[in-house]
Amino acid sequence: MKGINHLVSNIKPSKSGLLLALTASAFSLFTLMIIEVIHRGSFAAFINWADESTVSFVMSFLLLFFLVGALLFLPTIIFISLIAIEVIFWFVVSLGSFIKYQLRGEFFTPADLYALNEGADISTLMSDLIGWKEIVGFVVTLLLLGVFSFFFIRYKKMVSFRKRLLLSVFSVICLAIISTQPSLFTFRSFSKEVPTVESYGKFGFIGAYLTLVEKANIAVPNHYDKEEINKIVKKVNETKTEDVVDPDFQPNIIVVLAEAMWDPLLLKNANFKEDPLPYFRTLMENYSSGSMLTHVYGGGTFNTELEVLSGLSTRFTPEEIYYNQVNQPIDSLAYVLRKQGYHATAIHNFKNWYYTRKDIYELIGFEKFFSMEFFNNPSYIGPYIDDRILMQKALDELQKTKGPDFLNVVTVASHGPYNDIRYKDLPILATSDMKMTELSKYILNLYTNLLKDVDDSIRLLIEGVKEIDEPTMVVIYGDHLPFLGEEYAVYRELDFFQGDLNNYEEYKKMYQTPLVVWDNFGGQSEKEELRMTPNFLGSYILAHAKKEMSPIFRLSRDIYKQGQTIIPKKTFYKQEGVKEAEFQDYQMLQYDALKGKQYSYANRNLEPFEGYVLGNGKIKIDSVQVEKTKNGTYRLDIHGENFVSGATIFIDGEKKKIKFTNENLISTTIKIKGDSSKETSSHEVSVAVLDDDGKTVIEESNSKTINFK
């Protein structure tokens, strides 16, 4: 080290600037290598990209180089801290993008910044995707970061502050130009639609990401104003329709999103011991059914769900998470049906905050939301609450309310990935003569067994509805194909996906899920063969139930009735016979709802339900009975309403263990250790349901004052 110090100390000031630039260049190349090697999965893939996409490689390097340059004017300790944070940031983000691709066939997008909670939560199920290579890579990164820090410290102080300030100003200007002009990464326009995965392959992580950021800025449509929206709404309302509206007919409407439900019998090279979906298949054979062409694979559930509920299409938005755009009330099935006398309830056996459902369900008009925190002592399949418990909750809700119900039911027990242990003994239901890895065999069998449970939960719901004997329709759809192994392992090993996934036939296979519409009031009505994208399902449901529609659903229905039931990727408009001009009014109303002034909502009260609540209803304490059991120990019996087994009792703000008897009675014990003042003084008792961080209160009761004596 002394030798290096001596060598550095003898460097002439005229050369120090050059050496600082060389160090910054080496550091930028090092950072770029980290990003692309991790993101692409190998060093060889990084070299191939640098050779085949030289322009993108150079622009990525320059952006990182100018990023370092922009920080040169800072004090050394701050400069070193920031470049260390930069390297660690790129390491984590590129690794996250790589893992996302392994799981869902998609890379990191700007909207993933809105889903950090979801990513962190699901990552607990994916620890096997981070192995010794990633750990060694991180350690090596830190060591090399230390080496670069040494040279930066030495060379930086040899360059005057004035020169460093000028370099920083120049770097900021260059950085701004590159960041706001992603077309520089290819020297061409991005007006042509390029699939996200393909853009990451060609333009690199940085270039593709900046491209998506640019696309995320939704331009105001031509001619968008109040007059134009009113003209569209008037035209929609005056369009004649064959659909019958009957205000006196009020069937219950249950919409079931079946997590990752797909027909595995489509895997022709797999041999199944039995059909894992016998009940569901019977429904499809006897009732209107078919397929839904979704826009997500292996994940992105809430995109599909929101399309169904809102009548809007993700095909009119950038390739990003749809729900992050819902930050104000928007029209939905919940609003439309509540206006016609329905109760609107969402039920989901997973966490309230996942996909920010708790907030968005309120914005789109639901009255209450049952999330997993409000299920009492549920049984589990692996890490998830059994869907049969979910269906029983839906049946209970039907019987409890007066008047018609709209239930949005979202399952979760069949959620991927499928390399974990969920059953004590996993029956072998699927085999194949094809060459499959042991992991792929396990994944296929676990998924097949989970489908059996999904099928049984559907049976429980339908048979339960029959017993209630009220006019009811049940719509069941799969939100996306299951994630069956990294890089589509099961699909490829069984030759289901073949070759280029960007061709039309492979596209349909990758995004097509089952759909069925069951009812007990249709009589001998003709069975329909259904094929649609999720945005058309909401208006189909309203028409089938003979309900009035709002403008967005009426327009959706008009387009559907004209035979345009699919809005695919723009790449495949020709194959589907789609003319973009046909969607001009549709896109205009969607912009008005999400980004515009909501002119189309004039004279409509789209205010969230005033009494919106999580769970069955507001938690309420009616009374607290105090009983002394032995010296200094007291038992508290708390009587009230809507208690849940996962609640927490607070006495003077201190958590106490709960004994759950039922929704009207919970208990706890408290020990007073030799403090007579606590026995004679007053104490505040309350009940709350906490988020999974154990701190955040998501629902709480009133408080009651008690005395132990």
Regions found by a protein language model. Name each.
Residues 2-199, 619:
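Transmembrane and membrane-interface helices of multi-pass
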Residues 180-255:
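Membrane-interface segments at or immediately adjacent to transmembrane helices
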Residues 237, 241-247, 258, 263-637, ...:
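Solvent-exposed soluble domains appended to multi-pass membrane proteins
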Residues 643, 660-663, 679:
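Extended, solvent-exposed regions of the mature portions of secreted/cell-surface glycoproteins
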Residues 654-659:
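Surface-exposed loop/edge segments in extracytoplasmic proteins
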Residues 661-672:
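Aromatic sugar-binding surface patches on proteins
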Residues 671-684:
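Surface-exposed, short loops/turns at beta-strand junctions within beta-sandwich domains
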